[in-house]
Amino acid sequence: MSGALTHDVVIVGGGPVGATLGALLARQAGPSGAARVLVLERQLPPPPDPAAPVGLRVSALSRASERVLVAAGAWPAIAATRRSPYERMHVWPEGGTPRGAGSLSFDAGELSEPDLGCIVENLLMQHAALGAFRAAGGTLATGELAGLGFDAQGVDVRTTAGDYRARLVVGADGAQSIARRLAGLEAQVEDYGQLALVAVVRPERPHESTAWQRFLGAGTLALLPLADGTCSIVWSLPQAEARQRLADEPAEFSRRLTAASDGVLGTLSLEGERAAFPLRRLLAPRYAIERFVLVGDAAHVVHPLAGQGVNLGFLDAAALAEVLARARAEGEDPGALRVLRAYERWRKGDNQLTSAAMDGINRFLSFGRGRVSRLAQRGLGWVDGSAIAKRLLIERAMGLSGDTPTLARRRAG
């Protein structure tokens, strides 16, 4: 192709992170007018149906992510459809109790916040972000990436939807990123040998807008409260055991799940289908080359135990949007490696730190019973008794501390 530029930025992947980045960029104005942004997505999500059951794939959005979605123009559609704020969280290891010694509890009131975050379906986030992107004047193409051709002036983007030429291509197409592979960037992948089993269950007792997380010898169990009184579960198990739980009759599944939860909410009854996906840790050693950059799961995948995966992706989107806005204001080429390395330096260290922390916490707290478990309980108990340590953890989880992008610090409204 190697002709005239058709777009300033082409984003490969229109999931929640890619679509949000697209909306942020499309809303930017510069001396030459609005940025020309195209998002390429393989398959568009169906319109959300508030009457339909809650989807199996959900995310725990931090306060910082909420602010990024507000800046992108996507939050009103989410707030108007279905979201589930949670106000408290209890964490405890096997051998302990959820509110006893050796547990860790968080309360939004400790930060004078209305909640710690909210549970939102991934498809709803994606639909809202794509809607905001189109409303901002972005171009949405449905198709698959077929090739990338780089030269000094731009990138030829070959897709099943047509061919484009851009100054910058962003890989936002997830852990199995085709864009990353075509750009020649590597990824270090570690398989945990586990599956994350997801389902929606109805607890016997009210969940009290509280998230519950129990570390077990064979994995972790998270109960995420939903606005209709049900809970979304994420239960990480060794692969063979997870497959058995998928095949269990509902009554047997309920019995085993209730036991794994330590009966904290009484009997947990299955509602609807179950699904599972493999757990892997992924880190890209490099995020950027000339005219190409990675965001979200294409750059990093962390253990889901703290729900930080999509939140890291939204921080990537906000940081890249800020770096590109600065470059645009200064008349710089958005695809220049110097510009993209500024984003990489900003986000890679934080993402690697979070990944290592999630990996370490999971390994340390998932020892079941015994000496290591008792040490874990003492550690959790110490943090729970230290107002300073606890506040630092809450602020970190909510995205309220550290070198966060301006859009993530800006309060809604």
Residue locations for each model-derived region?
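FAD/FMN-dependent oxidoreductases across multiple families
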Residues: 243-337
